[in-house]
Amino acid sequence: MMLTFNQYNDVLKFEGEQMTIGNPVKILLVEDNPDHAALVIKGLRSNNVANSLVHLEDGESALDYVLQRGRYADPSTSPRPDLILLDLRLPRVDGLEVLRILKSNEDTLRIPVVVLTTSDAEMDIAKAYDYHANSYMVKPVSFEHFMELMKALGCYWVAFNKCAE
């Protein structure tokens, strides 16, 4: 059965203002551009997708958070995310290196990583998939298309996708 974006709302179960099927999803957004981060957050929230969202601005902080090191060592205050939205062009440690490290670590390799970037360079796409990205999405220029992308991303990764425990 094929659903349009408008039909997704008829299928999804809403709890409060959050889109959920099963347990709420913890999302980590790794984005250094504050305007892009604001758009992602707005897009997710306006589509009732942002269950629990942590925003970090550089690759080193993202690695510390996901690997629970340093100031993020306590899993009760820094739980591992269920989904990572990862930009490629990041300060301190670039997104491809973050992806490579996470997907080569036994404790984090099953966390879905969606590359969400402005780069449509074939080399970046190929390298991301070489490092086992679960999806590669190019940020649209149009605000309307960006909001549609966030809704589709949320519907798939938050509501429909089933991850390994």
Task: Please name every model-derived segment.
Residues 1-28, 34-54, 60-63, 67, ...:
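Non-catalytic signal-transmission and effector/linker regions of two-component phosphorelay proteins
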Residues 75-79, 103-110, 131:
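Conserved phosphotransfer cores of two-component systems
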Residues 87, 117:
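Active-site residues of response regulator receiver
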Residues 90-93, 102:
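Hydrophobic residue at a beta-alpha junction
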Residues 91, 109, 121:
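The feature encodes the CheY-like receiver
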